[in-house]
Regions:
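N-terminal secretory signal peptides that target proteins for export/translocation
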Residues: 1-15
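Bacterial N-terminal signal peptides
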Residues: 17-27
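N-terminal leader/targeting segments and the immediate start of mature chains
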Residues: 27-68, 81, 212-223
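Gly/Pro-enriched, hydrophobic low-complexity segments
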Residues: 37, 112, 134-223
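Solvent-exposed strand-loop boundary residues in beta-sheet-rich modules
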Residues: 64, 107-109, 186
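Short, surface-exposed coil-to-beta transition loops
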Residues: 69-71, 89-90, 97, 162-166, ...
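An acidic-aromatic
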Residues: 73-124, 190-191
Length: 223
């Protein structure tokens, strides 16, 4: 009995397809391994640090409105303390003492006070740097993409009880965070660029305390 066999090019096509699938699978595993290694480098860098200081540039773009740019110096101290000193606008201050957040705006002659956990300010995502940084615990759907010599890591928060829906980190090969982009549920975007990072500088605890200046209006959240 005569048996018809598929042409040789059919076998070649099947073999090539299987080879391609295999190569893609190996490539995906290698990419995942590289991303995992980079995430561990970032975690190690910031989990070991007790204090941190960086110069920041901040762009805030509300949905359908013009972008607003601000800049200054950010100082962090574990546990739970941070201080944003703004050069632009001059005198603006955002402080956390680990329990409360304070926002002082000289141009409005007003200071706002709120509990740290109740804050919906989108600077709050950076607070994870004040504790034990764990990407797998804090975020889901982590993806990495090369951007020059750096890697852009995209992620979503695991909990929905936060004012943002997505975060991106631009990270150097040695685990330094150069940029953080936060997208809110209202589609507003807050983009931070960091430079001149100093790990474990001496920071006085008084930097993270705030006294309302005389004559300034105090607004307390929930009051």
């Amino acid at each position: 009995m005569f048996h018809a066999f598929p042409p040789l090019y059919v076998y070649s096509g099947v073999s090539a397809s299987r080879l391609l699938i295999g190569l893609l699978a190996v490539s995906a595993v290698a990419a995942d391994a590289r991303l995992d290694s980079l995430l561990k480098a970032v975690e190690g860098r910031y989990n070991r640090a007790k204090t941190l200081q960086v110069v920041f540039h901040e762009d805030y773009t509300p949905q359908g409105k013009p972008r607003r740019s601000e800049s200054g110096t950010l100082q962090l101290r574990k546990p739970g303390r941070m201080r944003w000193d703004y050069d632009q606008p001059k005198g603006k201050l955002f402080v956390s003492d680990g329990k409360y957040l304070w926002l002082y705006t000289p141009a409005e002659n007003r200071a706002e006070k709120m509990k740290f956990q109740e804050s919906e300010d989108m600077r709050a995502p950076l607070a994870f740097l004040l504790g034990k940084l764990n990407f797998e615990k804090e975020f889901r759907n982590l993806e990495g993409k090369a951007e020059g010599a750096d890697t852009r890591i995209a992620a979503e928060p695991r909990t929905e009880n936060l004012p943002y829906s997505a975060v991106e980190f631009l990270v150097t090969a040695d685990g330094r965070i150069k940029q953080v982009k936060v997208t809110g549920f209202d589609r507003s975007v807050l983009d931070f660029a960091f430079d001149q990072e100093k790990v474990d500088p001496a920071l006085d605890g008084k930097l993270f305390q705030f006294q309302v200046p005389k004559g300034v209006e105090l607004v307390e959240a929930g009051q």
